[in-house]
Amino acid sequence: MSDKLVVWMDCEMTGLRLDSDKLIEVSALVTDSDLNILGDGVDIVIHADDAALAAMPPVVAEMHARSGLTDEVRRSTVTVAEAEQQVLDYIRQYVPTPRTVPLAGNSIATDRAFIARDMPALDAHLHYRMIDVSSIKELCRRWYPRIYFGQPEKGLTHRALADIKESIRELEYYRRTAFVAPPGPSTAEIAAVAAQLGGTAQTAESPQVEGTTQAD
C-alpha cells in the first residue's frame, strides 16, 4: 500500500438507512502524506426523485433544505453511475493502481457503505484500510481532553466538499497537538515500548510487506 497519498471522501444522503436512502452528493479530494490537497477535487450533486426526498427524516430534510442541497438535487441530471465515473477519473489522476491508497474522512465507514452499495467500481479501486478522523477525536476525548475541547469549530455546512476540507483540517490539528513530533521517538525508545507491551518492534530496515501475515 502507498504511504504517500490519501483519498478523502464525503457523501450526503437522504438518511442513513442503507436499505432505502439515496446518495445525493459525493465529493473527493486526494492529499499527500502531509495533507496537502492535490488538484481541485470533485463535488457532484446526484439527482433523486421527489419520493426519495419526501422520505427524508425531518432533521435531514431541514438540514439539506437549509444548505440548498435539496434544490440542487432536484435540478441535477447526474446519475449515480455518472458521478462514480467522475470521481474515479479524478482519483485515477493520482492513484492509477487499484487498492493502493486508503480512504479517509469522518465516520468514514458510513460513507464507505453507501459507496460500496452504489459505486462498486470506485469502492474496488480504494484500499480496504480506512483512516477515520472520528476515531482520533474519540481517543483525544478520553486521553487528551484539552486537545479535544480545544479543536477548531466546524462550519457544519453539511455539504460534502466543505466537510472533507474540515476533516483534513481536523486531522492536521490532531497531528500538531496529539501526535509525537517528527521524526518521532528513537529506535531504542520504540524497542523499549514494544518490549513493555510484550512484542518486538519492526526495524526501519525491514518494513512489513503488504499481504504478509502481520495482523492488520
UniProtKB/Swiss-Prot annotation:
Annotated keywords: Cytoplasm, Exonuclease, Hydrolase, Nuclease
An annotated GO cellular component: cytoplasm
Entry-linked InterPro entries: Exonuclease_RNaseT/DNA_pol3, Oligoribonuclease, RNaseH-like_sf, RNaseH_sf
Disulfide bond residue pairs: none
Subcellular localization: Cytoplasm
Residues in Exonuclease domain copies: 6-171
Function comment: 3'-to-5' exoribonuclease specific for small oligoribonucleotides.
UniProt name for this protein: Oligoribonuclease
Biological source species: Nocardia farcinica (strain IFM 10152)
Phylogenetic lineage: Bacteria, Bacillati, Actinomycetota, Actinomycetes, Mycobacteriales
